[in-house]
Amino acid sequence: MVKRIGMRRLAAFAAAAALVLGLVGCGGAQSTAQGNTEPVNLSVWTYYNGDQLESFNKLVDTFNNTVGKEKNITVESYSQGSVNDLETQVMAAAQGKVGASAMPNIFMAYADTAYAMDQMGELADLAPYFTDEERAAYVDSYLTEGDFDDSGSIKIFPVAKSTELLFLNDTDWKLFAAATGARYSDLETVEGLVKTAEAYYNWTDAQTDTPNDGKALFGRDAIANYMLIGAKELGETIFDVKDGKMTMGLSEDVARKLWDNYYVPYIKGWAAASGHFRSDDIKIGSILAYIGSNSSATYFPTQVMLSDTESHDIELKVLPTPHFEGCEKVSVQQGAGMAVAKTTDAEVEASVVFLKWFTQPENNIAFAVGSGYLPVTHAANDMDAIHSSGLALTGNMENVLMEAVDAVNTNELYTTKAFEGGTDARSKLNYSMSDIATADRATVEERLAAGESAEEAEAGFLTDEYFEAWYQSLCDALSQYEG
């Protein structure tokens, strides 16, 4: 069901008031709507829900009551539900399917969807509407994500981004740390995380007389991110894209490193994934920590529910995502941007006015604080600027933004370039390791229940031959997407 946007005026952000991006015409860029004599109505489709939708709602109506009113532009925003629902609706509109809605002026899109729409000739290039100075205000990699042909085009405009962090049930961690001497710094590397996970499994196993009933320490929301970013830190690019054509770049050595630090700990019970999201697993106490998007922070539970009658309150500790030891740190760049449909000049110009306004520091910070996402300009990606905004930060949101902003400002950011079939290829990568790990752990648990030792139950899954068979099957699956 589509949902109409709500309304609220926001306080001005005094510290960044001087940075007004594109609300007046600048030399070198196509001028944007300077007070249209004819009203322009814009439709925006998103997949936002919950806090993120509420935060977006407030800003849209602020625009309508201020700059939009001045320039005769009205924005109407609709949530299409989920990411998949939005992609389906946009594609149906673009293809003119019977019963489909009219194409929106602006819609949220990930790179692969936007690339497909661009190949259909549906997207406007926003580059002519930005001066070099205006472009320089944005985090560069956020803009280049929408430059499909490396010509400097802007086919996806960034409005909010995210990266990954480690979210920890600090309450129960402290019990483990007090008993074993474990430290937060042990979780700074992937190798340290796995070693600590082994210690946590053994420590929890020793709490009962039942053998092999230890608990997993961690989980991951996106295995594809782990593999893509891990490979990048280890010197390889799994999806190497040039001119829209992908060449797979994953050596057996790097694949083995990735395997040893997720599949192996998973089948040993040191890592786990059972709920739809790892925050669900935190809630039932099956894991103590997870690596996931900073935008997932609002879903971190405040209680662990061990049963219908047993629960306890927990506190969140936010830490940087673990990186591979001895490697340059790479952080994932994720989050959909806004694509503008190729319609009339007046509508495209009005769309740019709205997007520039939305990404002014005071407005972008307001959205980030309300939703857990990150601002997209250099000026707004700064904790001093966020504090100066005057907007209230909860303790958790303060820590989330601090760690995420630090990752963006200090680490290399990486996201895959768009290519035909990219969404399906990423899905195959995502499930290639997680599905086999889940199935094999279930087999191990059956064998343990039948009386086998852990060594006996796991042995067949830890051989070189077993890894090599998986690696070859992955290469075969991904090779069909090569250009």
Explain the meaning of each model-derived region.
Residues 1-42, 455, 461, 465-483:
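Short, low-complexity disordered leader/linker segments with a strong preference
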Residues 68-141, 175-176, 288-289, 307-310:
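Extracytoplasmic "Venus flytrap"/periplasmic binding protein-like
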Residues 95, 267-268, 307-378:
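Extracytoplasmic/periplasmic substrate-recognition and gating elements
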Residues 108-165, 209-210, 230-231, 313-322:
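Hinge/lid segment of periplasmic solute-binding proteins
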Residues 127-138, 182-186, 211, 216-218, ...:
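Short, solvent-exposed loop/beta-turn-alpha elements that line the ligand-binding surface or hinge
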Residues 149-164, 191-247, 287:
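Extracytoplasmic/periplasmic solute-binding protein
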Residues 194-201, 241-275, 321:
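Glycine-centered hinge/linker elements that transmit conformational signals in sensory
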Residues 405-483:
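Conserved C-terminal helix/tail region of periplasmic/extracytoplasmic solute-binding proteins
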